[in-house]
Regions:
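Non-catalytic cap/lid and distal C-terminal segments of serine-dependent acyl enzymes
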Residues: 1-237
Length: 237
C-alpha cells in the first residue's frame, strides 16, 4: 500500500504557495532513498508514478520501501516556464527557493536518515533539476533526466563545475530535435543539446547511463521509461 500526503509550502522568497505531495510505502524505514520530483502532478497523472512505485514494491519490497518521493508542481504552463527556464522571470528565485527554503525544511519533516538523494524531471523539469543539482553538487547522488530541455547556457553551468560524482540516468528521443516549444515557438534542439550535455557530464566525472530511443518529446515516452529510471535510482551506486 502507498501513502500519499498532499501539502502546501509557502515561499517567502517567491511570496506564493506551492502544492506538493509526499509519497511513501506504508512501511516506514529508518533509511530513505529520497527522490525530489519536479512536474510532480504530471508524474502522478500522466507518468503514472504510483503504479511504477507499486510494481517496484512487489518486485523488490525490501529496498523499494525505502523510497520517499517529494513531488512538487510549479503551477500552470507559464508558471512552469518562468520557474524552470533560465530566461524565466522566476528562474533564479526558484533555484534559491528550492535550495534554501523547500529542500531543507521538507527533509527535516521526513525524519529519516537520507542515504540517497536524487532529482527526477522531464523536459524543462529535468532542466531545473540539473540546475538545482548544480547549486550544491555534493548534495546529490542521482539525477534522472528524461528528455532534458537544456540550453547552451545550462550546459555552460555544468562546465563551470569543478567535478561531480553524480550517477546520471539520461534518456532522449531520436526525433526530439523536431520539437518546437508551444510557449515560445522556438526549436529547442533537445536531442542535440542532450548529446552535448552528456559529453560535458562525462568530462566532469559523472557516471552515466545514456540512451537515445525511437521516441518523440511526449509523455508516452517518459511514462514507458519511468520504471527504468526508478530502478537506476534504487540499484545503481
Amino acid at each position: 500500500m502507498l501513502n500519499r500526503t498532499k501539502k502546501t509550502f509557502h515561499s517567502n522568497i517567491l511570496k506564493q504557495d506551492y502544492e506538493y505531495c509526499v509519497l511513501t510505502s506504508d512501511e516506514e524505514t529508518e533509511e530513505a532513498y529520497l527522490l525530489h520530483v519536479q512536474d510532480g502532478k504530471d508524474y502522478l497523472e500522466l507518468g503514472e508514478l504510483e503504479n511504477a512505485f507499486q510494481n517496484l514494491l512487489e518486485k523488490q519490497p525490501e529496498i523499494a520501501r525505502k523510497l520517499v518521493f517529494i513531488l512538487v508542481h510549479p503551477g500552470n504552463s507559464m508558471d512552469r516556464w518562468n520557474a524552470y527556464h533560465h530566461k524565466g522571470k522566476k528562474f533564479k528565485q526558484y533555484l534559491t527557493f528550492m535550495t534554501e527554503e523547500f529542500l531543507p525544511e521538507v527533509e527535516v519533516e521526513i525524519g529519516r536518515k537520507i542515504v540517497r538523494r536524487g532529482l527526477l524531471g522531464d523536459s524543462l523539469a529535468a532542466n531545473i533539476s540539473l540546475n538545482i543539482a548544480g547549486m550544491s553538487p555534493e548534495t546529490w547522488t542521482h539525477l534522472l533526466l528524461q528528455s532534458a530541455a537544456v540550453s547552451e547556457k545550462d550546459i555552460e553551468m555544468v562546465e563551470q563545475l569543478k567535478h561531480v560524482q553524480w550517477l546520471v540516468y539520461q534518456t532522449v528521443g531520436k526525433y526530439e530535435d523536431e520539437y518546437v516549444s508551444l510557449l515560445t515557438n522556438e526549436n529547442l534542439y533537445i536531442l542535440t543539446r542532450n548529446r552535448e550535455l552528456h559529453e560535458m557530464l562525462v568530462k566532469k566525472g559523472a557516471r552515466i547511463v545514456y540512451s537515445e530511443q525511437e521516441e518523440k518529446h511526449e509523455w508516452r515516452f517518459w511514462k514507458s521509461d519511468l520504471m527504468n529510471a526508478l530502478e537506476f535510482f534504487l540499484f545503481t551506486s
